[in-house]
Protein backbone atom coordinates (compact mmCIF):
# COMPACT_ATOMS: atom_id res chain seq x y z
CA UNK A 1 0.00 0.00 0.00
CA UNK A 2 1.33 3.39 -0.99
CA UNK A 3 1.74 5.88 1.85
CA UNK A 4 0.62 9.48 1.13
CA UNK A 5 3.38 12.12 0.97
CA UNK A 6 2.68 13.92 4.24
CA UNK A 7 2.42 10.66 6.12
CA UNK A 8 5.67 9.38 4.61
CA UNK A 9 7.43 12.61 5.51
CA UNK A 10 6.15 12.26 9.09
CA UNK A 11 7.29 8.61 9.29
CA UNK A 12 10.77 9.55 8.05
CA UNK A 13 10.98 12.37 10.60
CA UNK A 14 9.85 10.08 13.44
CA UNK A 15 12.33 7.36 12.45
CA UNK A 16 15.18 9.87 12.20
CA UNK A 17 14.26 11.34 15.58
CA UNK A 18 14.24 7.92 17.21
CA UNK A 19 17.57 6.94 15.64
CA UNK A 20 19.27 10.28 16.39
CA UNK A 21 18.19 10.04 20.04
CA UNK A 22 19.26 6.40 20.27
CA UNK A 23 22.52 6.41 18.27
CA UNK A 24 23.39 10.05 17.76
CA UNK A 25 23.60 12.02 14.56
CA UNK A 26 27.00 10.75 13.38
CA UNK A 27 26.15 7.08 13.91
CA UNK A 28 22.85 7.34 12.04
CA UNK A 29 22.76 7.15 8.25
CA UNK A 30 19.97 7.94 5.84
CA UNK A 31 20.08 4.23 4.95
CA UNK A 32 19.31 3.42 8.62
CA UNK A 33 16.42 5.86 8.55
CA UNK A 34 15.05 4.43 5.30
CA UNK A 35 15.28 0.87 6.67
CA UNK A 36 13.41 1.84 9.82
CA UNK A 37 10.64 3.44 7.76
CA UNK A 38 10.57 0.66 5.18
CA UNK A 39 11.34 2.87 2.20
CA UNK A 40 14.41 3.49 0.07
CA UNK A 41 17.12 6.05 0.76
CA UNK A 42 16.10 8.12 -2.27
CA UNK A 43 12.75 8.83 -0.61
CA UNK A 44 14.49 10.17 2.51
CA UNK A 45 16.54 12.48 0.29
CA UNK A 46 13.46 13.46 -1.72
CA UNK A 47 11.67 14.76 1.39
CA UNK A 48 14.61 16.20 3.34
CA UNK A 49 17.53 16.43 0.86
CA UNK A 50 20.17 15.90 3.56
CA UNK A 51 20.56 14.25 6.94
CA UNK A 52 21.48 17.71 8.26
CA UNK A 53 18.06 19.06 7.20
CA UNK A 54 16.40 16.19 9.08
CA UNK A 55 18.48 16.98 12.15
CA UNK A 56 17.62 20.67 11.97
CA UNK A 57 13.90 19.98 11.65
CA UNK A 58 13.99 17.62 14.66
CA UNK A 59 16.00 20.11 16.71
CA UNK A 60 13.55 22.88 15.79
CA UNK A 61 10.63 20.72 16.89
CA UNK A 62 12.20 20.34 20.33
CA UNK A 63 13.06 24.04 20.60
CA UNK A 64 9.54 25.06 19.55
CA UNK A 65 8.00 22.52 21.91
CA UNK A 66 10.08 23.89 24.79
CA UNK A 67 9.22 27.50 23.95
CA UNK A 68 5.50 26.76 23.63
CA UNK A 69 5.49 24.83 26.90
CA UNK A 70 6.72 27.86 28.80
CA UNK A 71 5.18 30.67 26.81
CA UNK A 72 2.05 31.44 28.83
CA UNK A 73 3.33 30.62 32.32
CA UNK A 74 6.58 32.52 31.94
CA UNK A 75 4.89 35.63 30.53
CA UNK A 76 2.70 35.84 33.65
CA UNK A 77 5.62 35.94 36.10
CA UNK A 78 5.82 39.17 38.08
CA UNK A 79 9.17 38.67 39.86
CA UNK A 80 12.57 37.10 39.29
CA UNK A 81 11.77 34.47 41.93
CA UNK A 82 8.59 33.45 40.13
CA UNK A 83 10.39 33.41 36.79
CA UNK A 84 13.30 31.30 38.09
CA UNK A 85 10.85 28.79 39.57
CA UNK A 86 8.88 28.68 36.32
CA UNK A 87 11.97 28.24 34.11
CA UNK A 88 13.27 25.42 36.32
CA UNK A 89 9.83 23.78 36.27
CA UNK A 90 9.65 24.22 32.49
CA UNK A 91 12.98 22.49 31.87
CA UNK A 92 12.25 19.68 34.34
CA UNK A 93 8.86 19.11 32.72
CA UNK A 94 10.35 19.15 29.23
CA UNK A 95 13.28 16.83 30.02
CA UNK A 96 11.02 14.46 31.95
CA UNK A 97 8.76 14.25 28.91
CA UNK A 98 11.77 13.79 26.57
CA UNK A 99 14.46 12.09 28.71
CA UNK A 100 16.87 11.39 25.83
CA UNK A 101 16.91 14.98 24.62
CA UNK A 102 19.53 16.30 27.10
CA UNK A 103 22.08 13.78 25.81
CA UNK A 104 21.09 14.58 22.24
CA UNK A 105 21.50 18.34 22.73
CA UNK A 106 24.79 18.16 24.61
CA UNK A 107 26.38 15.46 22.47
CA UNK A 108 25.64 17.23 19.22
CA UNK A 109 26.94 20.54 20.58
CA UNK A 110 30.21 18.89 21.60
CA UNK A 111 30.69 16.83 18.45
CA UNK A 112 29.81 19.22 15.65
CA UNK A 113 30.72 22.85 14.99
CA UNK A 114 28.04 22.75 12.26
CA UNK A 115 25.46 21.86 14.90
CA UNK A 116 26.71 24.60 17.24
CA UNK A 117 26.04 27.10 14.45
CA UNK A 118 22.61 25.58 13.87
CA UNK A 119 21.83 25.87 17.60
CA UNK A 120 22.70 29.55 17.40
CA UNK A 121 20.33 30.00 14.47
CA UNK A 122 17.50 27.88 15.90
CA UNK A 123 17.67 28.60 19.61
CA UNK A 124 19.78 31.65 20.37
CA UNK A 125 18.14 33.67 17.59
CA UNK A 126 14.65 32.26 18.36
CA UNK A 127 12.21 35.18 18.74
CA UNK A 128 10.29 33.53 21.59
CA UNK A 129 13.53 32.89 23.49
CA UNK A 130 14.63 36.49 22.92
CA UNK A 131 11.29 37.79 24.20
CA UNK A 132 11.49 35.58 27.31
CA UNK A 133 15.11 36.62 27.94
CA UNK A 134 14.11 40.29 27.65
CA UNK A 135 11.37 39.66 30.20
CA UNK A 136 13.91 38.03 32.54
CA UNK A 137 16.25 41.00 32.09
CA UNK A 138 13.46 43.49 32.86
CA UNK A 139 12.33 41.56 35.96
CA UNK A 140 15.94 41.45 37.20
CA UNK A 141 16.30 45.22 36.69
CA UNK A 142 13.02 45.83 38.54
CA UNK A 143 14.00 43.61 41.47
CA UNK A 144 17.50 45.14 41.68
CA UNK A 145 16.02 48.67 41.75
CA UNK A 146 13.51 47.58 44.40
CA UNK A 147 16.38 46.17 46.49
CA UNK A 148 14.98 42.63 46.38
CA UNK A 149 18.04 41.06 44.75
CA UNK A 150 21.68 41.95 44.22
CA UNK A 151 23.11 42.88 40.81
CA UNK A 152 23.30 39.80 38.56
CA UNK A 153 23.95 39.15 34.90
CA UNK A 154 20.70 37.79 33.38
CA UNK A 155 22.60 35.60 30.93
CA UNK A 156 24.69 34.06 33.74
CA UNK A 157 21.55 33.38 35.80
CA UNK A 158 19.78 31.68 32.90
CA UNK A 159 22.87 29.68 31.93
CA UNK A 160 23.35 28.49 35.51
CA UNK A 161 19.71 27.45 35.88
CA UNK A 162 19.62 25.53 32.61
CA UNK A 163 23.02 23.93 33.28
CA UNK A 164 21.97 22.73 36.73
CA UNK A 165 18.72 21.23 35.44
CA UNK A 166 20.45 19.71 32.42
CA UNK A 167 23.17 18.14 34.58
CA UNK A 168 20.50 16.47 36.72
CA UNK A 169 19.23 14.63 33.65
CA UNK A 170 22.67 13.90 32.23
CA UNK A 171 23.62 12.20 35.50
CA UNK A 172 20.74 9.71 35.24
CA UNK A 173 21.68 6.15 34.25
Predicted features by range, described:
Residues 1-7, 14:
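N-terminal intrinsically disordered/low-complexity leader segments
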Residues 25-26, 115, 149:
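Conserved hydrophobic residue
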Residues 165-173:
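Short, flexible, glycine-rich and Lys/Arg-enriched loop motifs at helix boundaries
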Residues 129-158:
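Hydrophobic alpha-helical bundle segments that form small-molecule/ligand-binding pockets
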Residues 92-135, 156:
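Short secondary-structure transition hinges
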Residues 60-65:
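Short, basic, alpha-helical segments at the C-terminal edge of helix-turn-helix-like DNA-binding modules
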Residues 11, 15, 19-53, 57-58:
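Helix-turn-helix
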Residues 72-103, 154-161:
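Hydrophobic alpha-helical connector segments
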Amino acid sequence: AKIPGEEMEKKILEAAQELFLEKGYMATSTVDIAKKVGCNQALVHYYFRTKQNLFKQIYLQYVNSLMQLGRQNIQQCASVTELVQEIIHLYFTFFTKYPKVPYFFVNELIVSSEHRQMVKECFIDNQMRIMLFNQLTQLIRNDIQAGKIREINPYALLQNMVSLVLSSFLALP
